[in-house]
Every structure is written in C-alpha cells, then in structure tokens.
C-alpha cells in the first residue's frame, strides 16, 4: 500500500474479502494515512448460499475500521441482513435494511438484490433517498464473482470521474454484458466474460482521451 500510494496514487480503492481482523485494521490505517478517495467496500462476510466466510472478530473489525471509511458499501442480501439486523425478503425490506446501514456508517449503500430476489434489481440508498437500478435476470450458470466484479467496476468508474449514480449504472451495464456473453470455462459455476467488450470500450475511451489531450496541447500552444 505504501508503494502504491507513493508512486501512482489511485483515484479509487476497492476492498473485497479480508479475513483477518489485524489486516483489516492495518488497511484502514493506511487508507486514513494517505487520505484515500472513493473507497468502495464490498463487505464480504456471507456467501449468497448463506455460508459464513470470515470469523466474528474480522466482522467486528470490518464494522469498526473499514465500513466508516467507505464512500459506498455493496452488500448482498445476507450481508445486508447481518449489517442491519433485519431480514430481507422483499424490495421493501431492502429499503428498510439499507437505511440504518447508511446512517450508521455515513455512506451510500448499494444493496444487491440479484441473488435472492426475482430480478437483478439493486437499491442505492444515501442521504435518505432511494434509487433503483433495474436489470433482468440472465440465464447463465456462470455467475461466479459477479459481486466482486460489480464493486470493482463501480470503483473503476469513480476513478474515471463519473458520479456514483453513473458509476453504478455503467457497472450494471458491464455486468449484464459480461453475463450475456456466456463464457463457459471448466466445471461448475465459472466466471463471467470480463473481456466481452474490452476492445471497443478501450478504443472508445482512448479516442476520447487522445482528443482531449490534443485539445489541451493546442490550448497550451496557443497560450505560449
């Protein structure tokens, strides 16, 4: 972390599963030391199957040190239930549960409803307001890592300068495309196709960046 922040400072930070309480505390200390921006925390504690992924002391450390630093949290339904102490069975329950989480940790909460509820509808709750991001369930058994990818995509878009709403919307579109590409690797539930649109997306953004760079050079040259 020292090398990263001292060399090329990241414009956003995404934190996934951290199983050790000591490591959680150290990460939080370093993020605070470097005044990290756009911290996206995927509070990985409970698998969508309900299986417990980290020990109780790590959960306590996560709540005490990392969650209060987040700009946005991205819990799945079981994690939302753990953080709020409220059972979540409906979209109305998602709103009820997201409110105390947001108020406790003073951040936005993106409650992911795709695994337990009927459609891939996610709720963004912040400052007392709700915004839904709707999506249709895609028939693809290879969904391993969707939550991790979503939070990473949100952080990537925040780093590019998009607003939180835009970052979530773009991340949702990316996930939908990656799932629809139906990559089939190995046995069991495999990963989605992360590189399904990498070429066109890269070319589009590179063209925009080059155009901006050329415009800036012309402006600077004119001033000189």
Please give the residue ranges for each predicted region.
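Glycine-rich beta-alpha junction loops
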Residues: 19, 45, 79, 114-117, ...
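Short, charged, surface-exposed loops that flank catalytic or proteolytic processing sites
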Residues: 87-94, 159-169
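Short, small-residue alpha-helix embedded
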Residues: 81-82, 140-164
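Conserved N-terminal subdomain of the carbohydrate kinase-like
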Residues: 1-48, 52, 200
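Conserved phosphate/ATP/ADP-binding segment of small-molecule kinases
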Residues: 56-130
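Charged C-terminal helix
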Residues: 165-224
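Short pre-catalytic strand/loop immediately N-terminal to key active-site residues, enriched for Gly-Thr
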Residues: 130-144
């Amino acid at each position: 972390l020292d090398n990263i922040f001292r060399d090329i400072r990241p414009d956003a930070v995404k934190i996934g599963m951290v199983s050790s309480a000591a490591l959680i505390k150290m990460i939080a200390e370093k993020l605070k030391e470097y005044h990290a921006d756009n911290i996206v925390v995927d509070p990985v504690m409970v698998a969508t199957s309900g299986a417990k992924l980290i020990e109780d002391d790590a959960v306590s450390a996560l709540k005490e040190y990392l969650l209060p630093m987040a700009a946005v949290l991205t819990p799945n339904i079981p994690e939302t239930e753990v953080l709020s102490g409220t059972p979540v069975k409906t979209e109305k329950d998602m709103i009820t549960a997201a409110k105390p989480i947001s108020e406790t940790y003073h951040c936005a909460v993106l409650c992911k409803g795709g695994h337990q509820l009927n459609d891939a509808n996610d709720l963004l709750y912040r400052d007392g307001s709700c915004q839904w991001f709707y999506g249709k369930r895609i028939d693809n058994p290879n969904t391993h890592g969707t939550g991790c990818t979503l939070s990473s995509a949100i952080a990537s878009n925040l780093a590019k300068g998009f607003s939180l709403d835009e970052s979530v919307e773009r991340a949702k579109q990316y996930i939908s495309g990656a799932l629809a590409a139906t990559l089939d690797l190995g046995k069991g539930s495999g990963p989605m196709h992360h590189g399904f649109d990498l070429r066109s997306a890269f070319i589009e953004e590179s063209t925009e960046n080059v155009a901006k760079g050329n415009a800036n050079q012309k402006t600077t040259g004119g001033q000189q």
